Structures are given as structure tokens and as C-alpha cells.
UniProtKB/Swiss-Prot annotation:
Protein name per Swiss-Prot or TrEMBL: Translation initiation factor IF-1
Native organism taxonomy: Bacteria, Bacillati, Bacillota, Bacilli, Bacillales
Originating species: Bacillus licheniformis (strain ATCC 14580 / DSM 13 / JCM 2505 / CCUG 7422 / NBRC 12200 / NCIMB 9375 / NCTC 10341 / NRRL NRS-1264 / Gibson 46)
Predominant subcellular localization, coarse grouping: cytoplasm
Domain S1-like: 1-72
SUPFAM superfamilies in alphabetical order: Nucleic acid-binding proteins
Keywords noted in UniProt: Cytoplasm, Initiation factor, Phosphoprotein, Protein biosynthesis, RNA-binding, rRNA-binding
Quaternary structure and interacting proteins, as annotated: Component of the 30S ribosomal translation pre-initiation complex which assembles on the 30S ribosome in the order IF-2 and IF-3, IF-1 and N-formylmethionyl-tRNA(fMet); mRNA recruitment can occur at any time during PIC assembly.
Transmembrane feature ranges: none
């Protein structure tokens, strides 16, 4: 999958789950299961419920995503 194929959307973290997984509610109302990208994990960036984040979604599975940015 090329980098151009991903869909970037913004959302809010609703719930934290084990193994660095999060339930994120997108701006359009959908809820997706998202994991943390490697750079966020490397730099020990904390993500808590209520945080606004950017999520990358694959066009093949719109129910799962990757958190790529946490807004300050």
C-alpha cells in the first residue's frame, strides 16, 4: 500500500485499551480502533482519553487505524 492511499482524519480518543490500542471517535461520528505509530511510541508521547489526534485509515479496512499525531 502506497503512502498516498491512506485516509487522514481527525478524532478524539474515547477509551484506552491494552497493548497501546485506543478507541477513537472520528469527526464524522464513526468509532475506530487505533494503535500508536512507531514514532509516537519511540518518543514516549502519552495519549489519554479526551486527546485530539490524527488517525490514518487504510482504504481496505475503515474500522482500524494508526494514530500519527496528538494535538497539544
Amino acid at each position: 500500500m502506497a503512502k498516498d492511499d491512506v485516509i487522514e482524519v481527525e478524532g478524539t480518543v474515547v477509551e484506552t485499551l491494552p497493548n497501546a490500542m485506543f478507541k477513537v471517535e472520528l469527526e464524522n461520528g464513526h468509532t475506530v480502533l487505533a494503535h500508536v505509530s512507531g514514532k509516537i511510541r519511540m518518543h514516549f508521547i502519552r495519549i489519554l482519553p479526551g486527546d485530539k489526534v490524527t488517525v490514518e485509515l487504510s482504504p481496505y479496512d475503515l474500522t482500524r487505524g494508526r494514530i500519527t499525531y496528538r494535538y497539544k
